[in-house]
């Protein structure tokens, strides 16, 4: 993937906070379980999904439960970012990068016995690009599909309006999973896919349980018969659940101050690594006075990222200067773009004609990084004359309000890789609307290597 034009990268830096938290996972030591030969696992999750259909709702927690487990797409994104076949066994691309011909796997069934074929693929993508679609990738991916043809039951041809060098990658995201026409409408609560697991039970507020599907094409290599995702938002409750043996692992562990306790306990394995997640303080670009770029820059200069990282993550995070993670291809370090400079922040506010104190609302979802981090941010903003009233909301409230533009500032972790192209969508929740950026983004997509 080629690097984005420099002007593109600069415009991606216009938010108050941008950092990468270390990905921490705590697992029960496999050696300690060797004698039990467990065929089930209980995994802790920070947030409960609001739906189980990733094609209609934006929450990343949905994909964490269903993607590659229940629902699958044409391609698979591997941990190293490479793309390999999944429901498509192969594909070809024409010379101008606009037409993709996918050959589909034969003999694949949905969990209700329905056949997986080209008609299901066509239905899924037409549904994603429909006028009333709420698929979060509609603007970035599916609206760019000009035509879908199905020469036979195992061939799909997708013709794009404009070349997209990341198209095969996008086909591996959870927004592009394939649903059957007969079961798609119920996918929010009863998803039926082609993956190795099927939904057993969703005890709302507590857990989602999946069981092995014996009809899966590679069922012999699926070792776990049951997987339960248990929802534990509170950091201290995560610690207690691990110590009590109530869960077998906790991805994105929310109590960094407790890591040493687990690192010295031979019952556990602690994994620390990189992540594609970007923790940001999102600014509503459509609301005054945030529609003035000088105000947005002032917010950026008001934030001491090091103090935030130390206070929330015990130092286990890295500052970034744009909506690109170091794990993204083409990453450029822009951490110096908006350095911590309270006096410059005050000057920019004055230049923009903003009277201080400026009263704003800081809407915070449940994760500890947002709640604890929000308090730190509010204290920092106060020092430049911005009074942030904290509003703590539940996850469903956050999604319902924020994605309708009902917020001033918020704190959230964007976990999808290469999602900086969301800034080319003026209807996305942060309301960033720049024709210059959209033109650059289109040029970037058209010139990026597609293989």
Regions found by a protein language model. Give the residues of each.
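Extracytoplasmic/peripheral linker and loop segments enriched in polar/acidic and small residues
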Residues: 387-398, 421-451
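Ligand-site clamp/hinge motif
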Residues: 185, 215-260, 378, 387-389
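Aromatic- and charge-enriched surface segment that lines or borders ligand/interaction sites
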Residues: 89-134, 151, 157, 241, ...
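N-terminal lobe/hinge region of extracytoplasmic solute-binding protein
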Residues: 44-95, 126, 192-194
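Structural transition elements
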Residues: 314, 318-351, 367-372
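Surface-exposed binding/hinge segments that line
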Residues: 36, 103, 137-180
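Gly/Pro-rich hinge or "lid" segments in bacterial periplasmic/extracellular proteins
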Residues: 82, 164, 169-222, 226, ...
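Periplasmic-binding protein-like
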Residues: 286-328, 372-373
């Amino acid at each position: 993937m080629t690097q984005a034009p420099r002007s593109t990268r600069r415009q991606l830096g216009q938010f108050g906070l941008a950092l990468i938290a270390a990905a921490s996972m705590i697992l029960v030591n496999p050696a300690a379980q060797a004698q039990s030969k467990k065929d089930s696992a209980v995994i802790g999750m920070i947030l409960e999904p609001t739906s189980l259909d990733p094609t209609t709702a934006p929450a990343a927690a949905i994909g964490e439960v269903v993607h590659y487990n229940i629902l699958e797409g044409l391609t698979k994104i591997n941990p190293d970012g490479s793309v390999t076949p999944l429901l498509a066994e192969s594909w070809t691309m024409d010379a101008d990068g606009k037409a993709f011909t996918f050959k589909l796997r034969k003999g694949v069934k949905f969990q209700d016995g329905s056949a997986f074929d080209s008609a299901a693929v066509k239905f899924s993508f037409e549904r994603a690009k429909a006028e009333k679609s709420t698929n979060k990738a509609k603007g970035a991916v599916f609206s760019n599909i000009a035509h879908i043809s199905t020469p036979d039951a195992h061939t799909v041809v997708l013709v794009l309006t404009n070349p997209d060098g990341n198209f095969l990658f996008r086909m591996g995201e959870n927004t592009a999973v394939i649903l059957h026409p007969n079961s798609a409408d119920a996918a929010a609560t009863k998803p039926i896919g082609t993956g190795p697991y099927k939904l057993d039970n969703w005890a709302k507020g507590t857990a989602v349980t999946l069981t092995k599907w014996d009809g899966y094409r590679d069922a012999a290599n699926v070792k776990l018969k049951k997987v339960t995702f248990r929802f534990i938002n509170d950091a201290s409750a995560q610690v207690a659940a691990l110590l009590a043996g109530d869960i077998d692992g906790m991805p994105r562990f929310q109590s960094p101050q407790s890591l040493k306790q687990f690192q010295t306990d031979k019952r556990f394995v602690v994994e620390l690594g990189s992540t594609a997640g970007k923790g940001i303080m999102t600014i509503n670009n459509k609301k005054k006075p945030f529609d003035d770029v000088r105000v947005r820059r002032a917010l950026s200069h008001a934030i001491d990222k090091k103090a935030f990282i130390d206070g929330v993550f015990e130092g286990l995070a890295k500052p970034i200067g744009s909506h690109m993670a170091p794990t993204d291809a083409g990453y450029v370090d822009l951490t110096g773009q908006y350095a911590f400079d309270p006096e410059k922040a005050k000057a920019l506010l004055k230049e923009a004609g903003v009277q201080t104190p400026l009263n704003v609302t800081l809407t915070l979802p449940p994760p500890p990084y947002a709640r604890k981090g929000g308090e730190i941010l509010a204290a920092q903003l106060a020092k430049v004359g911005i009074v942030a009233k904290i509003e703590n909301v539940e996850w469903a409230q956050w999604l319902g309000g924020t994605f309708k533009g009902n917020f001033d500032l918020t704190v959230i972790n964007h976990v999808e890789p290469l999602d900086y192209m969301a800034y080319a969508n003026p209807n996305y929740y942060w309301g960033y609307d720049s024709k210059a950026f959209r033109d650059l983004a289109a040029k970037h997509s058209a010139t990026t290597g597609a293989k």
